[in-house]
Amino acid sequence: MSERPAAGETRFRRMNDLPSTHLLGAGTAMCAGCGGLQAVQEIYDVLGERTVFVNAAGCMTLLSIYPFTPFRGSWLYTAMACAPAGAQGVRDALDLLVAKRRLPPEEDLDVVVLAGDGASYGMGLSATSAAIDRGLDFVYVCYDNEGYGNTGQQSSAATPHAARTATDGGAGFPGAKKDLFAIWVANGPSYVATAIGAEPLDLARKVEKARRLRGSRLLLVLAPCPTGWGFEPGEMAEIGRLAVATGFWPLKEWERASGRVVHTKVRRPRLPVEEYLRRQGRFRHLFEPARDARRLAEIQAGVDAYWAGVA
């Protein structure tokens, strides 16, 4: 593996420090303006070419279609619920090759799971928990587009309250988004962080930190989805910035070594949540034909309550 930065150091202090050569090829079969693809591109650039991706069935499956895969490295495709088990097999095989001196330690690979929110929040959560319990040395990346985007944007455990999906009526999703960050932290991995591709420096620093550590390291990345959320592809980056600026998507990290949650980007004052919601078709029913003041106030109150608890 390439040399890792010392603890507390970062290569990424300014935008100019971000990689200028991209490892993920262009011309993929993904939807135009895919926020998940943007994040994967940025993550891959920081991790480097010596990476094995283990993909849970989902949107990113479209990247693995032979002979059009844009990855320079290796890719393993698994069913939706078992990507961490696939990562265990890859990690065990690499460790065995190193132990038998068939693979020099400096040529070892990072094992990275790619999974959507359907797998991460739902049917694959038990496999992830078991991998953390075993102390599996891997990076887990959830690209969270807040629904089953690959099959038509049905609601998932990641869908926010009131968002319209293919499985909910005109009033939108009646439930609330599951706090996967807290669930992962409760399992006791080495590192957990939230991120978004629209904040590339923050994302790069977190990927760099995750790569430096050992054990189970988990990244929860919001992935604005023009197809499922209802906005123009060219608005993807702005939607991502608004998710952070309104406080709807907190950027934070937790390390087992410190046991503390640290917020890495805090906007004060925050923009009203409406500025984020009104740009998305999945929330249009909150504004048209009449403004739903009660539900909008409920959503804003939920965001305010979260930040009231942040020191």
Question: What is the role of each PLM region?
Answer:
Residues M1-R13, A311:
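Basic/polar N-terminal segments that are highly enriched at the extreme N-terminus
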Residues G8-Y140, Q153-P160, G170-P174:
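Cofactor-binding active-site loop characterized by glycine-rich and histidine/acidic residues
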Residues R14-L18, G27, E107, A157-K209, ...:
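Conserved thiamine diphosphate
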Residues Y44-T51, R91-L97, G175, V185-G188, ...:
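Structural signal for hydrophobic packing residues in well-ordered secondary-structure cores
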Residues A56-G58, V221-P224:
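Short, well-ordered beta-to-alpha junction loops that form the rim of enzyme active sites
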Residues T61, N145-N150, P226-G228:
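Short gly/pro/ser/thr-enriched loop/turn and capping motifs at secondary-structure boundaries
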Residues C142, A193-A195, L218-L222:
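Short, conserved beta-strand edge motifs with alternating hydrophobic and charged residues
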Residues A223-A311:
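Flexible, low-complexity linker and terminal segments
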